[in-house]
């Protein structure tokens, strides 16, 4: 392999790896967008001296909550199912919480089971549980009355309500009705949650330290994933404040984080799905938790949002909840009032769709072109190959120029060797003579690397596109070999896991990819080069093997791009070599 080509490839890969690491760890994507002024937060900074304090602490246990005795309340836990055309939600009358939420149009990888969005549920921790007090207070665990209703416009509602009695610090009692009502619209992944606190006579507010109550997300979102084997999946806790999305992927394995910011929404999202809560009034106090529940396979990725103390004897709070795909097409609809059922403008939850960071505009252009190919041939694998072919054709002149520059360098190498030998003890003189020699020969030393470096932004953008594109999830290219472009291909399941490597399948794409890399290295190697420079020989074989292990479990869509791109480069190199011999 030619020295300049090797240097360019190595430099490209180092820059590529460094770019991925730095972007994910230190510079998560932030979106600057114009936004309407936000309203004052719920019960923000109450100053009334008439607030009855139930406890000065944010913590409150269920032993401090007394259910108002009534024979009409249920005596045992029951579950209720609400279904629309796209979701199936299971509720419990214990707290009025969600214990299962399945997406009917999306299957789990390698299974016909529908994606379960509520994971790690326990008796103490359910989705959209409400706790009186702060994030560390126990969720309300009382049995609620239930009312279900199907409205004439197709919406479905389920409500939970219960009278509750609390002891105040001054010895008095606070009695109120706690109600939660959910409203679902057909064809929409977003629904409404209304929380009502209706105080009885004599109620003078609700305060546990600096919170009235705390609402929580699911303990973990689905689909279930293996953190060790699926390195391309992730969980990120995010919120939107000061016209920016702020993201944190570090809340794992027991870590927690308190956040005090004025946020218009907060979410937990993965590569393909999101759980988002959008309150009517901005959130002021949040808490992120990555604790691991006993018996759970994976740590939680959970957020808590606290409401400010309630003044007076009643409060009504409204939340929109989105539990569904992180598809840019769907999430974008909440940026235009005419495109969604709730009149949202510029909500910017589309910022949760995975992208290439600062290269996102370039990624969108590539996505647009690929979607045109898909309309012509409705197969995402074929559309991917056609986009790769188009990019290789566009960059062929640059590839040819790089090869010609490398050949010219080989022709000048004898004279360069002479200069290096002549001035080996005088580096400054050698540099001056080399500059003079290149100028007289009409050769630019950067001409071999520069054309390859120009292609790097497109390479990064295509990497991000093929690794994260939502439509690849569940999209088949070749049935029996590549049934899902979002996961690795498979021609044989081992039935066990290979230690250290964590391989469970025999995959063909990584083998083809590595073979194409080796062939390309041999094709670009000049006669006798490996004998003259043994490090080149190591590079020819080491780099492909290194990437074989690195990409073995990569999504097949991503690896299909790399492999087909290598094959096209091989063909182009044959054409270039033939033209340069003439």
From Swiss-Prot:
Keyword match Translocase: no
Domain of life: Bacteria
HAMAP family, alphabetized: YidC_type1 (MF_01810)
PANTHER family on file: CYTOCHROME C OXIDASE ASSEMBLY PROTEIN COX18, MITOCHONDRIAL, OXA1
Subunit details: Interacts with the Sec translocase complex via SecD. Specifically interacts with transmembrane segments of nascent integral membrane proteins during membrane integration.
Role summary: Required for the insertion and/or proper folding and/or complex formation of integral membrane proteins into the membrane. Involved in integration of membrane proteins that insert both dependently and independently of the Sec translocase complex, as well as at least some lipoproteins. Aids folding of multispanning membrane proteins.
Taxonomy of the source species: Bacteria, Pseudomonadati, Spirochaetota, Spirochaetia, Spirochaetales
Protein name: Membrane protein insertase YidC
GO CC terms, sorted: plasma membrane
The family this protein is said to belong to: Belongs to the OXA1/ALB3/YidC family. Type 1 subfamily.
Keywords: Cell inner membrane, Cell membrane, Chaperone, Membrane, Protein transport, Transmembrane, Transmembrane helix, Transport
Protein's cellular compartments: Cell inner membrane
Entry keyword Chaperone: yes
GO process terms (BP): protein insertion into membrane; protein transport
GO molecular function, one term: membrane insertase activity
Residue stretches spanning the membrane: 4-24, 376-396, 446-466, 542-562
Membrane topology (UniProt): Multi-pass membrane protein
Signal peptide: none
Primary localization: membrane
